[in-house]
Amino acid sequence: MTNLQTFELPTEVTGCAADISLGRALIQAWQKDGIFQIKTDSEQDRKTQEAMAASKQFCKEPLTFKSSCVSDLTYSGYVASGEEVTAGKPDFPEIFTVCKDLSVGDQRVKAGWPCHGPVPWPNNTYQKSMKTFMEELGLAGERLLKLTALGFELPINTFTDLTRDGWHHMRVLRFPPQTSTLSRGIGAHTDYGLLVIAAQDDVGGLYIRPPVEGEKRNRNWLPGESSAGMFEHDEPWTFVTPTPGVWTVFPGDILQFMTGGQLLSTPHKVKLNTRERFACAYFHEPNFEASAYPLFEPSANERIHYGEHFTNMFMRCYPDRITTQRINKENRLAHLEDLKKYSDTRATGS
């Protein structure tokens, strides 16, 4: 596959025949290729470029300053090259993670919910650029999820009911140039969330694995079935050619779970290039308190409580980060048990 399928989203998804047809086409593209592109307009392109420019400027700052942009309340903030690990091996991008930006006066922050707190922004320009970009990505995310529901002949708000006040977040990445001894950017993995919308510069380095007939894919949300490192050295892998005027879109683990594997979470990896590379990966997510459920097996009792899922994934990824240390020290995971009970009660109506 050399060219990804590219779609233009309607300005509004109403449930009309054209929306249903487009939704089916999106699902078919994911089932065939694992990924597709959506066209962006001039305003979206401007916001993309402003976010990339802010990222480049931040990455030029001294390491001592960048390393100060962390928090023990939230996983938002700076991640140094080599700090993140996939399948036991270090990954090499610099990352700034932007989670939900909540003031210390927010009731959830005051109550000690894990992962809740203000983003440790490096400056106002960076903050404005990233928030503006994420708002634009969020609008696209809502339309994509409505179209996906229609394509499956489900009620239009099946997914967006979960994403109301969603725990949307973004990873802003800089990859260093390759060296004679280093070519790995990020090891093969799937993403833990619902939907991924990504933007990249013109350098290139992203590879995705399309669905392969008969290939068993792990259920990454289960403790014993991590997808990290799977098939990393086994073909086929598709190079995602940098293309102006598009964002790329692929499913995460929660979509695989909710659709019973009709949509597979797309494995992907990054190789370093001869030049530094900048990219943004946006995650359009359920509400922190929401529970995802199997759509086509109504009798199934299995649930993914999003807040627990997110917290577990980040604690696993950053075991030594000050955020993880505080969660453990103050037993903040106890709040998740209470949230899960409330979520289960609402789901069963009891």
Curated annotation (Swiss-Prot):
It comes from the Bacteria. It catalyses: 2-oxoglutarate + O2 + 2 H(+) = ethene + 3 CO2 + H2O; L-arginine + 2-oxoglutarate + O2 = guanidine + L-glutamate 5-semialdehyde + succinate + CO2. Coiled coil: none annotated. Residues 166-286 form the Fe2OG dioxygenase domain. Optimum pH is 7.0-7.5. Gene3D superfamilies: B-lactam Antibiotic, Isopenicillin N Synthase, Chain (2.60.120.330). GO terms for molecular function: 2-oxoglutarate oxygenase/decarboxylase (ethylene-forming) activity; dioxygenase activity; metal ion binding. Monomer. This is 2-oxoglutarate-dependent ethylene/succinate-forming enzyme. It comes from Pseudomonas savastanoi pv. phaseolicola (Pseudomonas syringae pv. phaseolicola).
